[in-house]
């Protein structure tokens, strides 16, 4: 009987995944600080990125260095934001948000992923109209639904979505109300497990069989690219076994 992966092998894989996640967060911190300054109290995007880093057990020293490199206190790489749109197999719409120091490399990598998995890149705006940009504050099961709903609506949230399959709750806001709602909920002792401004599809597409396999392959391949920060699609995640 063959042996499974060694403990060392699993650890190396875990370390690599953690390192890639840290790289993405550091880039987000860098771009946020460069765009809005290094003070998180006056820069909601930076605060969100810093919170993401701290939640991932990133040290404060690493976060501070990333901020200083972005504000010019230390030498660092300058990243720019680029967005690509396209279609996966089955007509699934895909948005790919990137932070890069080399657009030529990034677009080549993204185009290769689409092509390899049977999809195709589109022009700007070709699929974005199928999504809305929202603030999303996600709470794990166990939090009191009525308390959270009342606090969220009072704080200016647009909607509260409860997922009966696992009891999780999402509070949805307009992007410009995201920081206000997050701060109000935190002041009420309601801290989300995850908070971000993201794209949400207006309607999901169900795929199955080989199409589902190819869609999953494309999304995974895109997410594994170093320059890619976020990947959004309108596929029904249940159809992918997610």
Swiss-Prot record:
Q: Which InterPro entries match?
A: Integrase-like_N, TACO1_YebC-like_2nd/3rd_dom, TACO1_YebC_N, Transcrip_reg_TACO1-like, Transcrip_reg_TACO1-like_dom3, YebC-like
The places in or outside the cell where this protein is found are: Cytoplasm
Q: What is an annotated GO biological process for this record, any one?
A: regulation of DNA-templated transcription
Keyword terms of this UniProt record: Cytoplasm, DNA-binding, Transcription, Transcription regulation
- Listed GO MF terms: DNA binding
Q: Which GO terms describe its cellular component?
A: cytosol
Q: Which HAMAP family match?
A: Transcrip_reg_TACO1
State the family named in the UniProt similarity comment for this chain.
Answer: Belongs to the TACO1 family.
This protein is called: Probable transcriptional regulatory protein PXO_01555
Q: Which organism is it from?
A: Xanthomonas oryzae pv. oryzae (strain PXO99A)
């Amino acid at each position: 009987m063959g042996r499974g992966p060694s403990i060392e092998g699993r650890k190396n894989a875990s370390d690599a995944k953690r390192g890639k996640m840290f790289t993405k967060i550091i880039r987000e911190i860098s771009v946020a600080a460069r765009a809005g300054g290094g003070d998180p109290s006056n820069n909601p995007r930076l605060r969100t990125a810093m919170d993401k880093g701290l939640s991932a057990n990133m040290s404060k020293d690493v976060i501070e260095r990333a901020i200083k490199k972005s504000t010019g206190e230390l030498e660092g790489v300058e990243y720019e934001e680029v967005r690509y749109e396209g279609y996966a197999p089955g007509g699934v719409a895909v948005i790919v948000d990137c932070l890069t120091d080399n657009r030529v490399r990034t677009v080549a990598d993204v185009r290769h992923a689409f092509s390899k998995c049977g999809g195709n890149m589109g022009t700007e705006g070709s699929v974005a109209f199928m999504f809305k940009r929202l603030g999303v504050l996600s709470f794990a099961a166990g939090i009191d639904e009525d308390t959270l709903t009342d606090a969220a609506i009072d704080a200016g949230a647009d909607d509260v979505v409860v997922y009966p399959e696992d009891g999780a709750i999402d509070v949805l806001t307009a992007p410009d109300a995201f920081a206000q709602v997050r701060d109000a909920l935190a002041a009420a002792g309601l801290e989300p497990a995850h908070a971000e401004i993201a794209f949400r599809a207006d309607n999901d597409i169900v795929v199955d069989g080989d199409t589902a396999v190819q869609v999953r392959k494309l999304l995974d391949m895109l997410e594994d690219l170093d320059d890619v920060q976020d990947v959004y699609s309108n596929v029904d995640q249940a159809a992918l076994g997610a």
